[in-house]
Amino acid sequence: MDQTCSLESFLNHVQKRDPHQTEFAQAVREVMTTLWPFLEQNPRYRHMSLLERLVEPERVIQFRVVWLDDKNQVQVNRAWRVQFNSAIGPYKGGMRFHPSVNLSILKFLGFEQTFKNALTTLPMGGGKGGSDFDPKGKSEGEVMRFCQALMTELYRHLGPDTDVPAGDIGVGGREVGFMAGMMRKLSNNSACVFTGKGLSFGGSLIRPEATGYGLVYFTEAMLKRHGLGFEGMRVAVSGSGNVAQYAIEKAMAFGARVVTASDSSGTVVDESGFTPEKLARLCEIKASRDGRVADYAREFGLTYLEGQQPWSVPVDIALPCATQNELDVDAARVLIANGVKAVAEGANMPTTIEATDLFLEAGVLFAPGKAANAGGVATSGLEMAQNAARLSWKAEKVDARLHHIMLDIHHACVKYGGDNKHTNYVQGANIAGFVKVADAMLAQGVI
C-alpha cells in the first residue's frame, strides 16, 4: 500500500482481505487507531510495508483432529495454530479449547500476543492456537485422547526455538500435560515445548497464579501513580476460572473487598467480600466437572444474578477476567454512573472499543489486557529460562521477577502514554509493544 494512505484506507484494506473476521478486524482497529498519530510523527515505521506485514500472520496451520469418545464413536474437530510474528523470538501463546474458537479469534489473540510479549522485554514472538473442542462435560479419557490426537499433527510445527504453546481457556495443567507428553513421545525429545507444565516435569512455581497476580500488580501500580490503591476498595471480578481466582486472591492480599465472581450462567454477589476460605471453596466447586458459581451462591446464601454480568454492582475497580467483548458500552455507562475509578483487563480484549473510549472520555483509569494480563506469558518466559538452564527457582524468586516485569510494563506504558495526570495506558501499551517489534522487523529486512 501507499505509505501516505490514511488510517481508514489501511483498515479498509485489512477488512477487505478478511471480511468475516470481525474479532481480528476489531483488534487491528483498536491498535492502529492509537498508533496512527505516532506513525505520522515517525514515518520510518511506514517503510518496507511494515504495517501490512505486521497484520499478516507469518504462518497459519489448520487441521482436523479425529478422536474416539467413550462410546467408541468417531468425533471430528477443527484445530489451528497461528504463528503470527517471530521477529523478537519463538512464537509464544496459548492453546484455547472452546466451541467458539475460530480463525478470526485466534488471529486477534495472536496479534495481541505479539505486542503483549514484546512488552515483557523477554525474547518471545507472538502466536496462538486452539480448537472448537469443548472439554466441559468430557471424561478425562476423552480429553486425553483428544489432546493426543491433536498433537499427532501439531508436534511437527513446535520446538523450543520455534513455537512454545501454553494453556488458555479450556486448557489447564491437565491438558498441557497430555499434550506435552505426546510431544515428547512423538519427537523423542524432552526439550521445553510447552509452558504451564506440572512441577513434576519442568513447570514453574507461580505460573498458575501469574496472570491474576500480574493483573493486580499492574493495577496497583496504576492506582498508586494516581494517588489511589486497592486498600479498602470494592472490586468486581468477572469470571471464576484461573485468572479470576488468583486476581481475587491477590486483590484481597492488597486489602480490597472483592464482591463478585461469575461464569457463563450468571454472577454471585457477596457484599461482605470474599475471604480466603470462601475463595478456596469457590475453587473447589469450579474444579469439579460441572461446578457453577450458582452452586457457590446457594451454599453460602448469597445473591445470584442469573444470566447477568457483574457490571451492575457498584464498585471502585472492575477486573474483567472472563472473555472477549464481555464489557460493552451499556455496561460501561453503568459502571461510570456508579463511580468506578479503574478498569483493568484480565481477559483478552474483554472490553469493546466503544466501552474503552467511554472509560477514557470519563477519566476512568483503564489498563488494556496486553499490558495488564501479561503476567502469564511473562512467567511462561521465566519457565522457558528455567528449563533451558535445567534449574527450578523458588516461588519467591519467580514472584519477585513477575512483580518487577509488571512494574517495567507499567513504566513503558507511562513513557508512551503521556506522563501526565491521566496516562492513556491503551496508547502507551500499543506504542511500546509496537516499537519493540517494529524495530526488530526493520533491522532484519524484508522477510
Swiss-Prot record:
Its EC number is 1.4.1.4. InterPro entries: Aminoacid_DH-like_N_sf, Glu/Leu/Phe/Val/Trp_DH, Glu/Leu/Phe/Val/Trp_DH_C, Glu/Leu/Phe/Val/Trp_DH_dimer, Glu/Leu/Phe/Val_DH_AS, Glu_DH, Glu_Leu_Phe_Val_DH, NAD(P)-bd_dom_sf. It is an enzyme of class 1 (oxidoreductase). One of its GO terms (cellular component) is cytoplasm. PROSITE patterns: GLFV_DEHYDROGENASE. The record marks 168 as: Important for catalysis. It catalyses: L-glutamate + NADP(+) + H2O = 2-oxoglutarate + NH4(+) + NADPH + H(+). GO terms for molecular function: glutamate dehydrogenase (NADP+) activity. SUPFAM superfamilies: Aminoacid dehydrogenase-like, N-terminal domain, NAD(P)-binding Rossmann-fold domains. Substrate binds at residues 92, 113, 116, 167, 380. Homohexamer. Catalyzes the reversible oxidative deamination of glutamate to alpha-ketoglutarate and ammonia. Belongs to the Glu/Leu/Phe/Val dehydrogenases family. This is NADP-specific glutamate dehydrogenase. It comes from Salmonella typhi.
